Amino acid sequence: MQKKITTNITIISCLGLLFYSCSTTKKVPEGEYLFVKNKFIYDKEDPDIKKKKTIINKDLSDYVKQKPAGKFLGFFPLWQWVYNWSPAKFDETFQEYYRQDASVRNQKLLDSLLTKNNLSEYVGHSLWKERLYYSQGEAPVLLDEQQSEFSAKNLNRLFHDKGYFDSKVAVSYDKDSVAKKAETIYDIKLGEPSYIETYDQKISDQKIEEYLNSPIGKQTVLHAGDQYNFDKFEEERDRIIDLLKNRGYYDFNDSGEDLYFEADTLKSNKRLDVTMFIDKYIQDSLKTDSITPFTQYRFGKINIYADSRSFVDDESKLIKEEYKDYNVLYTKEPEYRPRYFTDAFVIRPGQLYRQRQEIQTKRNIFKKENINLHGFRINKQDSILNVDVFFTPKKKYDLNLFVESYASRYMNFAISPGMTLTSRNLFGGGENLETTLKGTLGSVNKDFSMNKAFLNAYEIAIETKLKFPYLLTPINLDNILPKRFTAESAIRMNASTQKNVGLDKTTYGFGFDMDISSSEFQHKVSLFNTEFISNRKKDRYYEVFTKDNNTKNEIKDLYYAYNPNAPIYVTDDELTDAIEADKGFQSSLTGEDAKLYVDFENMLYRKANISQNVLINSFIYQFTFNQENSFRPKSNPWFIQARIELAGNVLRGLDKAFGFNKAEPDREGNQAGLIFGIPYSQFVKFDVDVRRKFKLNSNSSVAGRFLFGIIQPYGNSDVAPFVRSYSAGGANDVRGWAPLTLGPGSKPRIDSKNQSLEFESMKLLFNAEYRFNLFGSLEGAYFLDAGNIWGVNKNRPETLFKFKDFYREFGIGSGLGFRYHIGTFAIVRFDLGYKIYDPSYELGDRWQFDNFNLLKPRIHFGINYPF
């Protein structure tokens, strides 16, 4: 422990020396100051200042122009240090060099600039290190008083928008001429706010006036007595525009002049008479303004060009098919039935224009896998909107090649090449057949395999999925399912086989899925979800899981010491069965030996789960609510996903009706029903995953997650299948632990190099992350994770969830991470996790601060955010 403390102190000391030895003012010119901070000071004598700050509710640093340079992980000015590593004499040369286009930056350009700046002795040198420091570092931010004055005016505009018309912002500076650093201080006096005395509406169009005075239309956010707030005026404007654009007023306020507010301040600038105006001015030939009613539009013709090449001047040359009032046009014999296109359309000929329906139509089109949207044109003709939509079909066949790689505690290295072949439009309605073939070659850790060859394991997997862009149901649901929902169905089959991976599984699967989704909601149902898993090498269990083998051998030694005349059993299973049946031996164990026997029973439970052959036939329903997909994405979006799975009930009914073959009775005399010699699983499983993100400012956010899951076997099953059980630890879990090594509950710790796999029937997990931009596409994060797994089997009381104690059994981990954004959608993640609170220790020793070692984090790699 002393060594760990010394190591941590050494690391912290080195960081401290680095901090003080790398001056951030090294390149600050004489008479200038390094700008280090903006400070905002409100009037302390104002008795209502707390309330006023709450009303403003803004990060003031977003409204000032000059900001201090960023700091690595929020603490270290790393990029300023890197910039200063480049000698100052090269600054002017490098500034001119990087001002040029990248295509002309070469040694010739660099040499000419060095000569120009009297640095001829460096001609011919690439200066790559110095250029790297200069280009990747960050130049010092110098105090700019003009920018500070501009920022003060910007702050005043903010306060004015919040109703403080008499606000005053005074700028001063705290300059340290010795350190060459300065702070800008903004002294803020808000004064008294202004209020809306009266609120009135003047609307020139009678139809719009009647609508805005209806129960829906008059739900205004502006009221007499409210404090003036410009944000509320914008909210009210957007509300009215949204209402009218969804009542046929296609081009309402597109000019920005149809709706406006006026505030009368003649009586007092503290009590305002506010009026909202809606009117449409046009100019006649004499350029005289006159008011005219707004046009309410309906859809006319909707022309769907199935191939963008079909847009020709002479439409008589096209094959035209009318389907449900839509015109579908082709250049040749149709490959797709008209319904494939029209299913996406929420807008219909003759309907009143509604902006939401236009947006939903485009979203539905973008979900179509076989076509690209080439154009969406709306043409006004009096009060009619004619629509032309152009599509480009994708290729009939598409081959996608991919390669994946990974490493784990079990597998030193694995590479997985694969390919997916897509055959589009099999039956003319947009049906696709996807076939994926994937192979894996890997090197199993020597602790888990007797085969010492480098590539000593493989897996081959194939999956076929037939996808339908509609619901496969006995009845037609077109008139029941709203158009804002898109529907899909899929029939899937898969098979895989392993060699020298675990117990060498062979897996077969089949399922029928239906998916109904809108912008925020998704309902997914899996019927006849069937999985068959066969472990071909069950006898290798103790070779693979060496910790369990050690436990078995220790109990074996105790058993033969207790009963020297016991027979020598041929198999390990015969031995463990005999030990389980010997109550006299069990009652003879005390102290550490009794604890060892509990570990032995847990090992047998684990072995039964992992090595069992499994047949699952289940029904699954999953509900997802995701505000990040809404029409107007929220700044603090929610994500909620709930899932329930019911397995074995159909087979149980058939078993009772027809009488399946039965397994040998267990110790309680129960006999499981068999199909092809395998007990079918019967259980109910429920999960809920709740997440929320909070945007703090343009560069940082906080994200949190709560996850709960439970599985309860019953009927034909005593234990839950391993593939449906819960584990804790890993890159998306409690990151201070490796996968499957945390828990269950407060199970005593063992040698981490010999850790058994841990899984159970119940899970609780909490995660929190503070995410912030470092520079460019690189993001940093601090995280805190807490969670564990527990059992629900009363025959194993040491693993049970206990309401009065569960919070003491949370594993708590923390750490920092880096995320690099590749393009728009992909993120490469690297996390360093540390154990903070370890429930495997005795109660008084669970906090791990004394054992904390900065040099030994748990390292995790991942793709995209963990939640």
For the regions a language model picked out, list residue spans one by one.
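Interaction-mediating elements
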Residues: 23-367, 481
